[in-house]
A protein has these predicted regions:
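Extracytoplasmic metal-acquisition and chelation regions
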Residues: 2, 36-305
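Bacterial N-terminal signal peptides that target proteins for export
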Residues: 3-22
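C-terminal segment of classical bacterial N-terminal signal peptides
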Residues: 25-35
Length: 305
């Protein structure tokens, strides 16, 4: 037999209970907003440092990256009022240094804040103006940057320090496949001659042990000056006579001279590998580096034929 249960009539809440219930609802609605407001504000000059900060900070950080367009030449970037506004509420600021992003130092100097912490990656790895500024291509750089980021996030937000420390360990471990690719390339191609249009890949090339040629030409390209006729001729000769196994070119900073070198390489059967200064959208730092190393490995292998 099915017996229908009668629901007892609801009692009206007393004024005291109504106020308590309302307060509880409002408190639950406010909690997410408070949690979001408590996020540590991080501003990174370059998006690969911003990506590392996001991986270490997770849900506890709000990261803004200024240079994030892989189709833009970072050397031509000019700071805007929007850039300055992004720094107003920053608690942690990360930039490359070594004169790669001098606009950031100027902006920070113009809007000093006592509670803001600045991480200059060049200082962490002992580099200065005049050195190759493309520090993120050195396998030793990101572990150092990650440790500094985790430390400063822990100081800014002690309640979540354990999360930052754990995420730091995960990040460092996630670099092992990249390091393994570097080691494998070094074991197979150490001493192999290559060339490049610009020294973007220089530190990675050194880590692999490649013989990088035409460095004066590369510096001229990076500094937006004209390479000497002798340096241009030497570069062209290396490509035409296949004195180098691979041409590495910066696809974000193409000039008429570098485009000509790329054409000579392709016409002469020298494999070309594109590298960028800015991390592509939709990829992590690890994926970006691994993909470029895979492309280099394929080009070095093809260049032997």
């Amino acid at each position: 037999m099915f017996i229908a249960l009668k629901r007892a009539p609801r009692r009206a809440l007393s004024p005291v209970r109504w106020l308590a219930a309302t307060a509880a609802v409002l408190s639950s609605l406010a909690a997410p907003a408070l949690a979001q407001a408590a996020a540590v504000n991080v501003v990174a000059a370059e998006n690969f440092y911003g990506d590392v900060a996001s991986q270490i900070g997770g849900r506890h950080v709000a990261v803004t990256s200024i240079l994030s367009n892989p189709d833009q030449d970072p050397h031509l970037f000019e700071a805007s009022p929007k850039t300055a506004r992004a720094l107003q509420h920053a608690q942690v600021v990360i930039y490359n240094g070594a004169d790669y992003d001098p606009w950031m130092a100027k902006l920070l100097g113009a809007s000093k804040q006592a509670k803001r912490v600045t991480i200059v990656v060049a200082d962490l790895v002992g580099k200065k103006a005049g050195d190759n500024p493309h520090l993120w291509y050195d396998p030793a750089t990101m572990p150092a940057a990650a440790r500094a980021i985790a430390t400063e996030l822990g100081r800014a937000d002690p309640a979540n320090k354990a999360d930052y420390d754990a995420n730091l360990q995960k990040f460092v471990a996630s670099l092992k496949p990249v390091d393994d690719k570097v080691a494998a390339l070094r074991a197979q191609y150490k001493g192999v001659p290559v060339t490049a249009t610009e020294p973007v890949f220089g530190y990675m090339s050194d880590a692999i042990g490649l013989d990088m040629r035409n460095q004066r030409f590369q510096l001229a390209t990076m500094n937006d000056t004209e390479a000497s006729a002798q340096d241009v001729a030497a570069f062209e000769n290396d490509l035409r006579k296949k004195q180098v196994r691979v041409l590495i070119y910066n696809s974000q900073a193409e000039a008429p001279t570098t485009k000509r070198m790329l054409k000579i390489a392709r016409d002469g059967g020298v494999p070309a590998v594109s590298v960028t200064e800015t991390q592509p959208a939709g990829k992590t730092f690890q994926q970006w580096m691994a993909g470029q190393l895979d492309a280099l490995a394929a080009a070095l292998s093809a260049g032997k034929k």
